[in-house]
Every structure is written in structure tokens, then in C-alpha cells.
């Protein structure tokens, strides 16, 4: 005799007869409702782009953070529940520091992503907890640029270019047509911004976009100010206008 669906909903540790964990699926829905975040690799490094439009004129825009420094050579973008994201970002920073103290060397991007996925997976198999309603894009440079996505289930995937959040489908479709392995840094930046514009179906405003990157030559995370972003946004908006007319 099978439990009604409500029974499987309440029990995170119980599979439904067709092999589903409903709470994990609901956590993925929380990510789909989140703001879009994009990651893209290029020859010179890896770039993260996040939508940080505010929903109220009373909100201090400077307090909204969507891209985080994890270590000198690693950054992360989030989409989903903000409080859950903060917990995972803190966890990632701690793991990076533990590795430095233990081995006297920086953690690799893949190892950090695996540790975060292991942590997330634990919250899918124990009673009294729920899955994290957030996905992370973890980006950085070891010997070469790396870009990983962590799923609420704890799954880990590596990408050349991808997105999380409500604009994922539009961005993925665009990247599948336009992405190339030999992109320069500037071209990758513009391509990522065009994808963001298509995801929100609007031209971009530099103040509403957060951008961070790590380059191969110095392996150091850097943020892009709205002033520095303007020439890239102007180039992207020309293409966005063309594509939105079609």
C-alpha cells in the first residue's frame, strides 16, 4: 500500500513509488524562481554575471550581493533562497581556509565544489532537515578556468557556459547557438551580457548587473564596477535590441 503524495512530501528520506524525492524537486523550483546568474569560460579566464535588480525603490541597492569571493582564485554566484545561499557561501569559505591551513596551498575549484555538493547531499537523506533551496555557480582558475554548478540534490556538473535561475532556459538556448571555445575575455563578457538581456527580455543597466571574474594570468578574483561595465553593456545592448526585434 502506497502513501498518498502528501506522505512523501512530508518525509524527505522516503522515495515515492516512481523514485522521486519531492522535497528535492521543490527545492529546484525555488531555484527556478530565483534571479538569473550566468557563468561563462573563455581562453583568458571565467566570468560570472548576476541580475541584481531591486524590487523596491526603498531598498539600498549596494546591500544586494549575488557574486561572492570564496578564495583568492574562486568566486560563486547564487540563485534561490538568499538565506540558504549565505549558509553555503560561508561553508565554502570555511572549506577553502581549512585547506590552506591544513595543506598550505589553495583548494582546487573542483575539490571545493565537491565539498559543497557533499554538504548539500546530506540534507536530502536525514530526517528533520530540508534540502537547500539554492544552486551555486562556482568559478575559478586552477591551471585552467573551471566552472561548476551545484544542484539542490548535491549533483555536480562542469560547464563551458551555463545559467541558473528563472532565465536558465533562454540563456542555455542562446549559448548553444553562440558559444565558442576560442572566445576572448571581452567577447565572452559581451556574450554573457547579451544572454542576460535575453533572459530578462530587456536592455541592461550597468547598476543592475553584478559581474566578477578570475583570469588565468593572475588567478585573482576581481569585481567589475558599473563604470567599467558601461562599454560592455553598450555593445551588448546593441545586440539585445536586434535579437528582441526578431
Curated annotation (Swiss-Prot):
Family annotation (Gene3D superfamilies): Glutamine Phosphoribosylpyrophosphate, subunit 1, domain 1
UniProt KW Phosphoprotein keyword: no
Q: Which SMART domains match?
A: Proteasome_A_N
Compartments where located? Cytoplasm
Query: Per its Swiss-Prot or TrEMBL record, what regulates the activity?
Result: The formation of the proteasomal ATPase PAN-20S proteasome complex, via the docking of the C-termini of PAN into the intersubunit pockets in the alpha-rings, triggers opening of the gate for substrate entry. Interconversion between the open-gate and close-gate conformations leads to a dynamic regulation of the 20S proteasome proteolysis activity.
Q: Does the keyword section mention Cytoplasm?
A: yes
Protein keywords:
Cytoplasm, Proteasome
Q: Which GO terms describe its molecular function?
A: threonine-type endopeptidase activity
Q: Name the principal localization, coarsely classed.
A: cytoplasm
Q: Name one GO cellular component term.
A: proteasome core complex, alpha-subunit complex
Q: Name the GO terms of the biological process aspect.
A: proteasomal protein catabolic process; ubiquitin-dependent protein catabolic process
Assembly notes: The 20S proteasome core is composed of 14 alpha and 14 beta subunits that assemble into four stacked heptameric rings, resulting in a barrel-shaped structure. The two inner rings, each composed of seven catalytic beta subunits, are sandwiched by two outer rings, each composed of seven alpha subunits. The catalytic chamber with the active sites is on the inside of the barrel. Has probably a gated structure, the ends of the cylinder being occluded by the N-termini of the alpha-subunits. Is likely capped at one or both ends by the proteasome regulatory ATPase, PAN.
**What family is reported?**
Belongs to the peptidase T1A family.
Q: Which PANTHER family match?
A: PROTEASOME SUBUNIT ALPHA/BETA
Q: What does this protein do?
A: Component of the proteasome core, a large protease complex with broad specificity involved in protein degradation.
This chain belongs to the protein called: Proteasome subunit alpha
Q: Which organism is it from?
A: Archaeoglobus fulgidus (strain ATCC 49558 / DSM 4304 / JCM 9628 / NBRC 100126 / VC-16)
Amino acid at each position: 500500500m502506497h502513501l498518498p503524495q502528501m506522505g512523501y512530501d512530508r518525509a524527505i528520506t522516503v522515495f515515492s513509488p516512481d523514485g522521486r524525492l519531492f522535497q528535492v524537486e521543490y527545492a529546484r523550483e525555488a531555484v527556478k524562481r530565483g534571479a538569473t546568474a550566468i557563468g561563462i569560460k573563455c581562453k583568458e579566464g571565467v566570468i560570472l554575471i548576476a541580475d541584481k535588480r531591486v524590487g523596491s525603490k526603498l531598498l539600498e541597492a549596494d546591500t544586494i550581493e549575488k557574486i561572492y569571493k570564496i578564495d583568492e582564485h574562486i568566486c560563486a554566484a547564487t540563485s534561490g533562497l538568499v538565506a540558504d545561499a549565505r549558509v553555503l557561501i560561508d561553508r565554502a569559505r570555511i572549506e577553502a581556509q581549512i585547506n590552506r591551513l591544513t595543506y598550505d596551498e589553495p583548494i582546487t575549484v573542483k575539490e571545493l565544489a565537491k565539498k559543497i555538493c557533499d554538504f548539500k547531499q546530506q540534507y536530502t537523506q536525514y530526517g528533520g532537515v530540508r534540502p537547500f533551496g539554492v544552486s551555486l555557480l562556482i568559478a575559478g582558475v586552477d591551471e585552467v578556468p573551471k566552472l561548476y554548478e551545484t544542484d539542490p540534490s548535491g549533483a555536480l556538473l562542469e560547464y563551458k557556459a551555463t545559467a541558473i535561475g528563472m532565465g536558465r532556459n533562454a540563456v542555455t538556448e542562446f549559448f548553444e547557438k553562440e558559444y565558442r571555445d576560442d572566445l576572448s575575455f571581452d567577447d565572452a563578457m559581451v556574450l554573457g551580457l547579451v544572454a542576460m538581456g535575453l533572459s530578462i527580455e530587456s536592455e541592461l543597466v550597468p547598476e543592475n548587473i553584478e559581474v566578477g571574474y578570475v583570469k588565468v594570468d593572475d588567478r585573482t578574483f576581481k569585481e567589475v564596477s558599473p563604470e567599467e561595465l558601461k562599454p560592455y553593456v553598450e555593445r551588448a545592448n546593441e545586440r539585445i535590441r536586434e535579437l528582441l526585434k526578431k
